[in-house]
Amino acid sequence: MDNEIIEVKQAEMLQAINRAEVDIQIATAKQYPRDINASLNKIATYAMMDKETAEDCFYVLRRQDANGNSSVIEGLSVRMAEIIAGAWGNLRVQTRIIGNDGRMITAQAICHDLETNFAVSKEVKRRITTKSGKTYSEDMQVVTGNAAASIAFRNAVLAVIPKAITKRVINEVKQVALGQAIDVETARKNVWQTSPKQV
């Protein structure tokens, strides 16, 4: 019995390591919980540094249907999701490519709020063929995969962080992006009527 060899499967070992890492991260998040007002202040500070940064926080797409009618789709960009995730804190976000069948590439993102133990998984598919059916080159597939992963990241982060909390600061950022805010510093402070020492 002393010389008995115990076989440990690699997959099981990796799962155990991942579980241990998550447990440590959750314990740390519980020990150092986020300050929501401080997080929102950070979002405002990062997003409203200047008009160009504020503009990067949003995307606008113009689409035309079969009847020739055009419509405008707008929303928060990947950059804004990165700012929100970094300022919010105590988040665990992972992205990966989970599928490539030669026609479509599928990216997955998982966002886990370590404080609330609420997690969301989002998948994004992107075509990797031309209109004529020719498959993209390897380099273009990598580029498309990275873009899909970024979009999945954005969707997962925005699904986890409550929109009701970030809505007001997002509106302030939009005003700066549109050039309608009188003063970036004033707009940032007015989000919560804070004093200069609190900003």
Language model segments and positions:
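Polyanion-binding surfaces on beta-sheet-dominated domains and ring/shell assemblies
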Residues: M1-I105, I110-V199
